[in-house]
Amino acid sequence: VGSEMCIRDSLNNYVNLYPGAVTPQQWGGVTIFPFGAGAGFHGIPGDVTPPSRFVRVAFYKATAPVCPTAYDAILQSFHILNNFDIPIGIEHALGKAPDIPSATQWTSAIDLTNRKVYYKTAYNNNIRCISMKKIDFDKVKYQSYPLDKELKQPIEEIIVK
């Protein structure tokens, strides 16, 4: 009961938020318009604290479309999770960041039905997949691999002719 109350109380602070557009309003004979699409979410917290990230993910998840395929659901998951990457240095005073960054080091999503784990890292935003179906857990002993072969984001150059 306590955690449910905490969740509800956190979200109650944002009862004024809703998905979609805000309708223009008349104020003293002047029509005022929203700044852009999605203005119904104006006021959603944007800082990197856990409570603010929780509120954002709750609203993003609640308004996400139902995906027709597992592939679409994984891509939608990463679109939502992209909003929660914490850049290196933002959590510390200027010049005080530790050697081990507390920034987002990897992001993952899991397809439980197809037994696949997807991930991307701070060094490579390409989504990678590990199929658990292809691993014979009776034969394979514990192993570990680096998440990245190289700590460098590949960039594809587009040549315009």
Predicted regions and their residues:
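C-terminus-biased signal that marks the final domain/tail of proteins
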Residues: R8-K161
